[in-house]
Amino acid sequence: LTITGADHGGGIFASGHADYLEISNNRIVNNYGTYGGGIRIGHPNLINPTVVAANDNQYGGYTNASNDFVRIHHNHIAQNGGGGEAGGGVALCTGSHNYQVSQNAICGNYTQGNGAGIGHLGRSNNGIIANNSVLFNQSFNQGLNVSGGGIYIGGQASLVPTTTPRPSPGTGNVTVSSNLIQGNQAGAGDGGGIRAEFVNGLDVRRTPGNPVPWYQLTVVNNMVVDNMAGMAGGGISLQDTVLANITNNTIANNDSTATAGAAFAPNSPNQSTPQPAGIVSRAHSTLLYNTIGAGSGYKFEFSNPTLLNNIVWHNRSFYWVIDAADPSSFGLWPDVSTNCTSTRCGPPVYRDLAVLGTSNPAHQLSPRYSLLTDLTGYGGANNITGDPLFIFEYTNGDQGQTIQQPELTTSIATAPAFDEGGNFLDVRFGPHSPTGNYHLNAGSPALATGTMQSGVPTTDYDGDTRPISSPDIGADERN
């Protein structure tokens, strides 16, 4: 079945009480929705008027739409558009418990909200996003900082009680497994590949000293490659995510362009501040940090994920500048193109892992048993460095390029609107067709140098079995 041409509710819209709904084997293309362009499950902002404000410690005042056990699989979801909130291709709103989004091709979708490919907004416990191809989706909004080019997982602000602010209801447990997340763009915010925010909140408030019932984000076996963020975290960005397990992923060749409005200091539109590009953790909100119990073992100022067996490689950091000697010349610095002739020429700058916004600039992430571009500046142990020897990798370049090896790069173009405020820069890059192969070649230093412990998946990106000891680092287990 082909569903196309919808102009308000998106291609498929399930409002409420749609337990066990199955959506499969469809072509859902060229639709528009105010909230969610391709497929939308539930409502993003439906308020429950019967809730007693002082007693709602679960949903924060939002209505549970009761769309449990929805299955969305084997669909072609492409070139849909969303007007706001979350989800250009697929939108999952509060009350979509135990959903599964799997084996879909989600490509070329757009949203002015968060999560151009897939958007999980609100509390929907035990969701699974697995084995999808999430390609070339874009989130952008000139007036708002919106995030998550490929996948967005986010809680909402509690509505009640209004007199005493509470943390977000959170998202519920979410697993993101074995997806290809490639070529997506969060042009006005964080997380070109994946953005997770407000995952935890009221769950922590209910048991501040006991983390066992808290919600957890699990990100395993994904290839997060060649994505781009206008702010930080071209690969993955986290905020208010207390429990996160990021294990056996390949996070490579993602870019941060520092072209979002928030990357510019006040009254300084001529040069932005460069941002880290691979995995970024932002400081917790004050409300959540004050809620976390001192005896819980998780009293950190920032999202401090478990980082195990990951390849985090060659994630590039740029910033935007106007040439002082020639104001008509502007663009990204450094210009890494092979035939560069501008004053902005230079080698790529790699910034793979970072913590932003805390009171202590020495705060750092702690990868373990991971392959990194550089071993300095991080906590953790048993990490290695060296070319991972992917079968075929590429880097982002000019929008018109077809395929480029990393050593034959072209420049990434920017399109400014100087008479506008907010996010006044749009970034144009390519290629825009599926390419590359981020499986491991023979001789890779990632082979048999990982560790098998709790939380490590027993199979890889392709479903191949991992050995019980010394698995490969990254999403691929070479067999």
Residue locations for each model-derived region?
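Extracellular calcium-associated, cysteine-rich motifs in secreted modular proteins
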Residues: 442, 454-469
